[in-house]
Amino acid sequence: MAAKTARSKATPTKENGVRVEEGLSLFKSDKFDADAYVQSKCSINEKDIKQLCSYLLDLKRASAEEMRRSVYANYPAFIRTSKEISDLEGELSSIRNLLSTQATLIHGLADGVNIDDDKVSDESLANGLLNFEDNGLSDLEKWATEFPDHLDALLAERRVDEALAAFDEGEILVSQANEKHTLSSSVLSSLQFAIAERKQKLADQLAKAACQPSTRGGELRSAIAALKRLGDGPRAHTVLLDAHFQRYQYNMQSLRPSSTSYGGAYTAALSQLVFSAISQASSDSLGIFGKEPAYSSELVTWATKQTEAFSLLVKRHALASSAAAGGLRAAAECAQIALGHCSLLEARGLSLCPVLLKHFKPIVEQALEANLKRIEENTAAMAAADDWVLTSPPAGSRHASTAFQNKLTSSAHRFNLMVQDFFEDVGPLLSMQLGSKALEGLFRVFNSYVDVLVRALPGSIEEEDPNFESSCNKIVQMAETEANQLALLANASLLADELLPRAAMKLSLDQTGQRTDDLRRPLDRQNRNPEQREWKRRLLSTVDKLKDAFCRQHALDLIFTEEGDSHLSADMYVNIDENGEDVDFFPSLIFQELFAKLNRMASLAADMFVGRERFAISLLMRLTETVILWLSGDQSFWDDIEEGPRPLGPLGLRQLYLDMKFVICFASQGRYLSRNLHRGTNEIISKALAAFTATGIDPYSELPEDDWFNDICVDAMERLSGKTKGNNGDVHSPTASVSAQSVSSARSHGSY
């Protein structure tokens, strides 16, 4: 066995998925010429056009996602700068008003100081006399004195509309008095100060009332509109947002997460509160302030902040516990509920789903990985006690109705059931762009299961690998018989070719509920199918790893003895000429055993691979190729043939030629004659002819006609398969049920 294992080591191939970015690198180049590229693609076929469309759609999605990330990365800085500019503009306006007021005071003081009584003209005295007697001016001063008291009364009685009208009236009169100088500078500045003080008082009243939880929608909008009329729009908008925040915070007091409650219910209730508040705030902002960029930017910043806080609450009270326990369905449903509420805001121009994804995606990925790990560990535990006998699904299983298709061993049944449940859970992951990650994770789990199947083969490499990490996974029930070993391949091939791809089709369904949308479904299918086709191809390539290990193991069993000696040595051909002409030509023993083994496996495969005959044929083809290619590449064998102490004689050449013809004959009858097999046998024959020619004899003069070889091959197949010459009909195909004779009876016809 040590010799077999030493010869069976090979470097495993690694599958690397082609990244989309590599395929799109051409489009990202600064030197990309769109017109030249389109012209070069005008002659491509339909398949290439579809592939190009897929690449362009991927580029579009990647570009949109990159732009969104860039916007959100720089948005806080943009908002902060905009707000600073707005504040600066407000300060400049205040400074301008202050300078104007001070200029008026200075001019008034200058006029009073510079009056010279000695130089007062008669005209000035007359004008002063007229002004003193002007009753209108006295009434204005009286009004200016009483106006602050009138404002105080309106504010005390909370007659907001009348107060706003009074403020407007007062500001108009102040403006006129300032232009016409109908009031003294002291009275004018006193009046301006009184109006500003009362306006500030009213603004404080409105802001306080707006932030009360008892303030209803109409009252809130009226208060904010009044606050805006007072001339402080930025504060009014901030108060509006704070009011909505205070209201939903007050409503949240009755919402308390419980360790025994369903996380989805808590998430749904909290989502309703938060995103309804954001939606109403957006509606109020648009109705009162319009689409002014400064206010829209503040709304986006505020909504993003509330969404961040919401996501942290859901993460702490609903997602974290589910993810830690590997509850993928619970975690995915919580995330889906939140994203569903959040997506409704996109109609209002608020795209906040990326904010949720930033927090939800890592923790849902954690639940996804925990779920996959559980599938891997449970399947490995089942494999430790698997008897490797194909059975129908357990009674009561949801897959029992398709039992005729799903005959698997116990560990594969368990793996399939867990995968089906897994894909029931991952539907909501599509909205988080985790569909590809789910497929990749399941590929890793399936690859791990195939490794378990490989270790179940007697003398497998992995079983003796000291670097293999998980010691618990080394415990696996050995598949001792050929039927058990074929069951390993039946497990892997059925899972990779049918069951897993069929389950993965659930990812192609429209999870938004619009499954009957005939316009969207073809596009979704076109976009997702290439990824799933590539995924299925990778699954099947993983099965090839098990197939190679199976064929290598059986080829080594044929070629080597338990002690490490070879059944396929040069001596069996170079020594045959010592027996002289008295040789009963028949295929060599090792090729008789190969034929018998293939027949036994074909008989077993007929029951195990129902509906998958192509896989059975490819397996027999691979096993035959393994033996022939090993002989073709065995340098020690050819060194003995070409340079050994005894040259290859005519009878040895004839026997070697017969063996290769025999392989070609039964492979052709069994429908598994491949190009590689044909090439390998031809190469062996060519090497043998060349070695014989080196002795100075024409090889073709020593070889009988092809009919002689064909007759012996047909006779050998009939005898080895238990048929008599009188039995008409074709030799049983190795892909049909064959009752082959035992190897011991085959040895009676062997010759060296």
From Swiss-Prot:
The keyword Ubl conjugation does not apply. Residues 515-532 have a biased composition (Basic and acidic residues). Keywords: Cell membrane, Cell wall, Cytoplasm, Cytoskeleton, Exocytosis, Membrane, Protein transport, Secreted, Transport. InterPro entries: Cullin_repeat-like_dom_sf (IPR016159), Exo84 (IPR033961), Exo84_C (IPR032403), Exo84_C_1 (IPR042561), Exo84_C_2 (IPR042560). It is found in: Cytoplasm, Cytosol; Cytoplasm, Perinuclear region; Cytoplasm, Cytoskeleton, Phragmoplast; Secreted, Cell wall. Coiled coil: none annotated. Residues 511-532, 724-752 are annotated as: Disordered. Disruption phenotype: Sterile plants with extreme dwarf phenotype and cytokinetic defects, and accumulation of vesicles in leaf epidermal cells. Impaired trafficking and endocytic recycling of ABCG36/PEN3 between the trans-Golgi network and the plasma membrane in root epidermal and cap cells leading to a strong intracellular accumulation of ABCG36/PEN3 and lost ABCG36/PEN3 outer lateral plasma membrane polarity. One of its GO terms (biological process) is Golgi to plasma membrane transport. The keyword Electron transport does not apply. It comes from the Eukaryota. One of its GO terms (cellular component) is cytoskeleton. Residues 733-752 have a biased composition (Low complexity). Pfam families: Exo84_C, VPS51_Exo84_N. The exocyst complex is composed of SEC3, SEC5, SEC6, SEC8, SEC10, EXO70A1 and EXO84B. Interacts with SEC6, SEC10, SEC15B and EXO70A1. Interacts with EXO70B1. Binds directly to B1L. Component of the exocyst complex involved in the docking of exocytic vesicles with fusion sites on the plasma membrane during regulated or polarized secretion. Involved in polarized cell growth and organ morphogenesis. During cytokinesis, involved in cell plate initiation, cell plate maturation and formation of new primary cell wall. Probable component of an exocyst subcomplex specifically involved in autophagy-related, Golgi-independent membrane traffic to the vacuole. Regulates autophagosome formation and autophagy-related Golgi-independent import into the vacuole. Belongs to the EXO84 family. This is Exocyst complex component EXO84B. It comes from Arabidopsis thaliana (Mouse-ear cress). The lineage of its organism: Eukaryota, Viridiplantae, Streptophyta, Embryophyta, Tracheophyta.
